[in-house]
Regions:
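Periplasmic alpha-helical coiled-coil/stalk elements that build and connect Gram-negative outer-membrane
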Residues: 102-215, 318-321, 325, 345-348, ...
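Outer-membrane beta-barrel architecture
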Residues: 26, 71, 236-239, 275-277
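Heptad-repeat amphipathic alpha-helical coiled-coil interaction surface used
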Residues: 18-20, 25-27, 86-88, 93, ...
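Acidic, low-complexity, intrinsically disordered peripheral segments
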Residues: 46, 375-429
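Bacterial Sec-pathway N-terminal export signals of envelope proteins
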Residues: 1-41, 47, 75, 192-230, ...
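Membrane-embedded beta-strand positions in outer-membrane beta-barrel channels/transporters
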Residues: 69-71, 115, 273-275, 319
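Small/polar (Gly/Ser/Thr/Ala-rich) solvent-exposed segments
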Residues: 12, 35-62, 73-102, 224, ...
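Amphipathic alpha-helical coiled-coil segments and their boundaries
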Residues: 7, 14, 75, 82, ...
Length: 429
């Protein structure tokens, strides 16, 4: 799980998406900052001298007017739109963080599931291979007994049929194991090697179903992400309403002009201008935008309610699966023990002629099926414990204390929030 946390492509893509979303905060904070621009121009102009007493009087000629200037615009008031855009971006970041936490939980659960699938498929393959060896010995003994007249050709055929079926089961088990290894490689990034036995995550499972539901409704990232989406939708209403407010800005400009009207006509101008724009009517589009934003708030709240119901149902389902798998392990263990006793008894009875070869083959098959079922039940027992912890929103590196450095979702935003200049990312790209 630690390796999957560090190297899983889907999880790393979600982290990159969060970093990109962080930049929206800085992008909208630009509305607080001044805009500055330099300009320069040059041209050709014909002039007619007409200034009394001037050497230019009565003369015609060409002048080359040119100049350069600096203009600075500062937003003073925009109907609180910049404030609300920044707050909306911050809420979007918080929602994206919860989305990252959801991806983290899914990745860790998928890694645990893939781990247990490899273990269970490996154990199943070993059982199927051992079964082939047992049936090969059974067929040899049956043929020996047939040669001395103790059994019929039918018994030999039955043993051969069971052996052929067992070999096909080995092939199926090998294919299943290869598929599980492929999924493990996809999620974790490496081939499975010397896997230790899996253990349930019981110490992180809530003590009761009611407690699990309370925790899930409070902490699950899908619900928290939906609540942040409601905040974003409400702020979009305020942003749309800001279009009805007056807009105010201050512009400062400095210009140096050369040969403006005639050669030698040079000068410097400077100005500071305040402007206020009061919207009266803009075709009604801004009112439609406000109504639309309010409808989006209602939709976001309904989605949040839907997510609560979804998480509640998921917790109930996973809790039931965990309880069922616990009982299944106990029942499968008892079934294996009973089938082992039954097989030993059938073999003893077959030696004295009270049981047929088919009885022995059936007893062996029942024991094999019970052992495979026990492996599956043990696998489900572990996976379902992880599923419950995931369903309540706690299958994370920080909560389960995995031996890996947790990814800091806040660090990048702190690095870029107040950057005024620069095109390089904090990691140097």
């Amino acid at each position: 799980m630690s390796r999957a946390y560090q190297a899983n492509p889907a999880l790393n893509a979600a982290r990159a998406n969060l970093r990109a979303t962080d930049e929206d905060v800085n992008r909208f904070q630009a509305g607080y900052r001044p805009n500055a621009a330099l300009s320069a121009d040059i041209g050709v102009q014909q002039f007619q001298g007409s200034i009394a007493g001037s050497q230019l009087s009565g003369r015609r000629g060409l002048t080359v007017p040119s100049g350069a200037g600096l203009t600075i615009n500062q937003n003073v008031f925009d109907g609180f739109q910049t404030d609300n855009r920044v707050r909306s971006a911050e809420s979007t970041v918080l929602g994206t963080r919860e989305g990252l936490r959801l991806t983290e939980m899914n990745t860790l659960f998928n890694a645990a599931q893939a781990y247990m699938n490899v273990l269970s498929d490996t154990a199943t393959l070993e059982l199927q291979r051992n079964n082939v060896e047992v049936l090969e010995e059974q067929l040899r003994q049956t043929r020996d007994r047939f040669n001395v007249g103790e059994v019929t050709r039918t018994d030999v055929a039955q043993a051969e049929a069971r052996l052929a079926g067992a070999r096909s089961q080995v092939s199926a088990a090998e294919a299943a194991l290869r598929a599980s290894i492929g999924i493990f490689r996809q999620i974790v990034g490496v081939e499975p090697r010397q896997l230790a036995p899996g253990r349930p995550l019981d110490r992180y499972v809530p003590t009761s179903l009611d407690q699990a539901i309370l925790i899930g409704l409070k902490e699950h990232p899908q619900i928290l992400s939906s609540l942040h989406a409601v905040d974003v939708a409400e702020l979009q209403v305020k942003i749309a309403e800001g279009a009805l407010y007056p807009q105010a800005q201050v512009t400062g400009a400095v210009q140096q002009r050369y040969d403006q009207q005639f050669p030698g006509d040079n000068g410097v101008t400077a100005s500071i201008v305040g402007r206020v724009n009061i919207p009266l009517y803009q075709g009604g589009g801004e009112y439609a935008a406000i109504r639309q934003a309010k409808e989006n708030v209602g939709r976001a709240r309904l989605v949040a309610d839907q997510d609560r119901d979804t998480i509640r149902a998921s917790i109930v389902r996973t809790w039931g699966n965990l309880e069922a798998s616990k009982a299944q392990v106990i029942a499968s263990q008892a079934q294996v023990q009973a089938n082992e006793v039954a097989l030993n008894g059938v073999r003893e009875e077959a030696r004295v002629g009270q049981r047929t070869t088919l009885d022995v083959l059936n007893a062996q098959q029942e024991l094999l099926s019970a052992r495979v079922a026990l492996i599956r039940a043990q696998r489900d027992r572990v996976v379902n414990s992880y599923d419950v912890v995931q369903a309540v929103g706690r299958l994370t590196v920080r909560f389960t204390s995995l031996p890996v450095t947790p990814y800091s979702a806040r660090e990048h935003l702190d690095q870029v929030r107040d950057l005024w200049f620069g095109v390089r990312t904090p990691d140097g790209r």
